[in-house]
Amino acid sequence: MIKIFFLSPILLFSLAVTLVSCDHDKDSSQAAVQVPASTTPSESPKLSLPPDSGPPPEFDSTRAFQYLKEVVAFGPRPVGNANHKKVEDYLLSHLKGDDVENDIFTADTPEGKFPVHNIVAKFPGTKDGIIVIASHYDTNYPLRNTSYVGANDGASSSALLLEIANQLHAKKLDGYSVWLVWDDAEEAVKSWTDADSLYGIRHLAEKWEADGTLKKIKAFLLADMIGDADLSIERDPNSTPWLEDVIYEAATRLGYQSHFFVHTVGGMEDDHIPFVKRGVPSADIIDFEYGYNNVFWHTPQDTVDKLSPKSLQIVGSTMLETIRILDKMDPLPPK
């Protein structure tokens, strides 16, 4: 993913979002073009939200953190790497007995052709529609020959989804179907561009648009870099404002609101963008201030010791509460 720049809420209200480039780390690649946001948070209409009901959702953060450590233990997992295949098998081993779609294809990249494997676990609900929760699981390709293991960037969110899967196993959901997506090849293999990035999720969005699945998706929730012990999820102008408002309401009901949307970032280039472009309500749940000035991002310092089970608890419980709120909102705001 790429962050373009920080903006204060006041500037967001008064200024148009600008096209810029990011040169955070030349060795780890990245420059990107911002997708303009159609509305700012202050323009989001007042939502009619259902009342709070029931105990907080179950989420085992200790187990989720163990998953995180197990993913990291495989080592670097860029596309085409033997460790990458081991992580694929690891994820699938946790989904035995579930309805799993394996979306496998070959990506043509600036560094050659690579196999790409999106894993989709489908949990059926009683309502017509789908809520998608996604995370990428690959690590940065340009850093493939270093000790970079992407503990926060890729492993934290992948572990989060495994624990969410535990909460959904063998349950008939009283609401929308929930699809969990571990998408592949999010990272650029050379330098971040529209063509060299988001390979897996772009393929999945195109496929679902072609087969009609896209029309059934009520919300697309992306988790990325959510394990930082100093957790602060930022508001993203490229995300759907009303959906971010629902996430904030979910966090507030659980007492976690201080960890959400205190700051606003410049538009994020991340796995939600192919769905944003297709009109699907989407939100990027991301903490892109990983160390001072994001110093640990895309470096070998992205390690488990900087992360916390509590952060996984905060995000995991908030995502499950978000699903519960969305299930009871009738109708959802228009796309």
Please place each PLM-identified region on the residue numbering.
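Bacterial N-terminal signal peptides that target proteins for export
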Residues: M1-P9
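Bacterial signal peptide processing site
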Residues: D23-K26
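Acidic/histidine-rich catalytic neighborhood of metal-dependent amide-processing enzymes
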Residues: Y148-A250, T264-G267, D271-H272
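Active-site-adjacent substrate-binding region
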Residues: L47, P55-E58, N83, T106-D108, ...
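A non-catalytic alpha/beta surface segment that caps or lines the substrate-entry region
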Residues: Q66-T126
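Acidic/histidine-rich, surface-exposed loop or edge segments in extracytoplasmic proteins
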Residues: L47-S53, A64-R77, R144, W182, ...
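Post-signal peptide N-terminal segment of mature Sec-exported envelope proteins
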Residues: S29-T62
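C-terminal motif of bacterial Sec signal peptides marking the signal peptidase cleavage site
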Residues: V17-S21
